[in-house]
UniProtKB/Swiss-Prot annotation:
Protein's organism: Bacillus cereus (strain AH820)
A Pfam family hit: DUF1450
Family annotation (InterPro entries): DUF1450, UPF0349
Coiled coil: none
Protein name: UPF0349 protein BCAH820_5046
Superkingdom to which the source organism belongs: Bacteria
Family: Belongs to the UPF0349 family.
Length: 79
């Protein structure tokens, strides 16, 4: 079974999205990855974000980011 891919930039983790990564890693239905740089420096500077199946998902807080990731997945099923 292919799982949704959630990607985080290490620079954004240092800026506060580490808690979102840790929460999402607990979900066995997600593949959560961490990379050195995803090339979204402007977005990274603005606040917490992740790539969800290749699409940028943002939040003004860690909690909002996690909620927005799940909302994106609900609205954009893989199959």
């Amino acid at each position: 079974m292919i799982k949704p891919l959630i990607e985080f930039c290490v620079g954004n983790l240092a800026s506060g999205s580490q808690a979102a990564l840790e929460k999402l890693e607990k979900d066995p239905n997600l593949d959560v990855m961490e990379y050195g740089c995803l090339g979204y420096c402007g977005i990274c500077f603005e606040g917490p974000f992740a790539l969800v199946n290749g699409e940028v998902v943002q939040g003004s807080t860690v909690e909002e980011l996690v909620n927005n990731v799940y909302e994106y997945l609900d609205e954009n099923p893989m199959f």
